[in-house]
Amino acid sequence: MRIVAARRCRGAWARGYRSRVPVSESLLRSALAPGGTLAAVPDDFSALGAHYSGKVRENYTRGDERLIIVTDRISAFDVVLGTIPFKGQVLNALARHWFEATASLLPNHLRSVPDPQAMRVSECRPIPVEFVVRGYLTGVSDTSIWRAYERGEREFCGHPLPAGLRKHERLPSNLLTPSTKAPKGQHDLSVSKAWLVEQGLISAAQLDELERRCLALFAAGQAMAAERGLILVDTKYELGQLPTGEIVLIDEIHTPDSSRYWFA
């Protein structure tokens, strides 16, 4: 990627990051690829902390906080397909909106948004489980609730499913259907709550409380989506634990990358 004025950008970014002063315009625009998208960040940004690169996000950890830069990359089924101009800014804005709107339902890791394409968050120990909530009998992957139902299975992640449901039909109630976070190159597995407890990944009491809170988050998301002519079909929540032991929502919430939406 061709970097333009990356060193000047780094200095301004670092000052804004250290002083925690919001930045009025995107400093990352100086790192755009010729096509107008942010596919990577300058090497100079490594001064912001230990670096980890995800499929879409660049992470810099320093002490008890993390700087997350949301790139314009788009991925599906663990493959980066390309970039979409300003996708990162849209994802970041949506995540911020939902974090702030739902903090009373489940605390989250957000500290501030120093740039349209980045956020400062509290460093957490991730819980190795994806908390997937589903409201409809749908999906395209082999591990989806619809594929299981199509194969004749009438129980999914410990939830009994009635006979006679059709594809894309609304489920009798919203369901928490956890999945494992498989190593890179492997598929996640949909599992039951009992399995998570048996594996020692989380206690039964914690899981019951988190199920209640995740379902509340999803219901709030569905209500707000309905007001705008949309259906929140299903979504994925990721959770982490602070050094204090408190469990908080991390990563993102109700974005198009983590959720399925339909037009109502």
Named regions from a protein language model:
Residues 17-19:
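Short, positively charged and aromatic/hydrophobic N-terminal segments
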Residues 120-122, 138-231, 242, 259-264:
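ATP-dependent phospho-/nucleotidyl transfer catalytic cores
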